[in-house]
């Protein structure tokens, strides 16, 4: 099946992400309580295409079910880090002149960008409007994207921990100032990072939610 389109600006029709209260689902489907884990069986060996495209599906993520349970409620605080610890959001996710597929976080030039969760680097290279970009595939089923970097500090296949430096802020690609363009994706499809992260408090939202295969 073809993957999602490779652009920074996605049409609004692609953005809805159903957020389901797991406790609400539990009485109707009690088997869900024992069939999920915050750690997923993810694909860790990458093809040349995996290393060169942003929107890539993980063949293991939906290999048994067409709905995936994403559980962030059991992740310890030490296994999460705000990607730009000293930064502030200057442009939110959603509709502006075009649809914005992530959030822009501003700080000084060459500030340290860190991995949000433990994971493995899938892509690290210059890519179109993203400039120098890094994609990290996480064991919780998510991927995070870090772009416009002045310098990438990791390469595909590197295993990274939450809080580990992976890049320096810059303005490579289509950018008017030094900042981090940060995205969250599932199976190649971007969604609002505020579902996962509290940008004002610089921490993550300990939700459990369902995501249907696209």
Residue ranges and their predicted role:
Residues 1-92, 204-214:
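Polar/charged, compositionally biased leader and regulatory segments
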């Amino acid at each position: 099946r073809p993957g999602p389109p490779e652009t920074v600006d996605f049409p609004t029709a692609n953005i809805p992400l159903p957020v389901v209260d797991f406790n609400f689902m539990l009485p109707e489907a009690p088997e869900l309580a024992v069939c999920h884990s915050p750690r997923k069986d993810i694909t860790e060996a990458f093809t040349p295409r995996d290393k060169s495209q942003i929107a890539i599906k993980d063949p293991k993520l939906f290999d048994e079910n067409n709905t995936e349970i994403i559980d962030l409620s059991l992740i310890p605080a030490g296994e999460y880090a705000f990607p730009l610890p000293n930064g502030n959001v200057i442009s939110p996710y959603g509709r502006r002149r075009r649809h914005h597929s992530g959030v822009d976080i501003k700080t000084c030039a060459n500030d340290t960008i860190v991995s949000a969760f433990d994971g493995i680097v899938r892509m690290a290279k210059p890519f179109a409007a993203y400039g120098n970009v890094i994609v990290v595939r996480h064991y919780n089923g998510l991927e995070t994207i870090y772009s416009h970097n002045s310098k990438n500090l990791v390469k595909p296949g590197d295993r990274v921990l939450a809080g580990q430096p992976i890049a320096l802020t810059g303005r490579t690609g289509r950018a008017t100032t030094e900042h981090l363009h940060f995205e969250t994706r599932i199976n190649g499809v971007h969604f609002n990072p505020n579902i996962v992260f509290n940008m004002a408090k610089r921490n993550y939202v300990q939700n459990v939610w369902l995501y249907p295969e696209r």
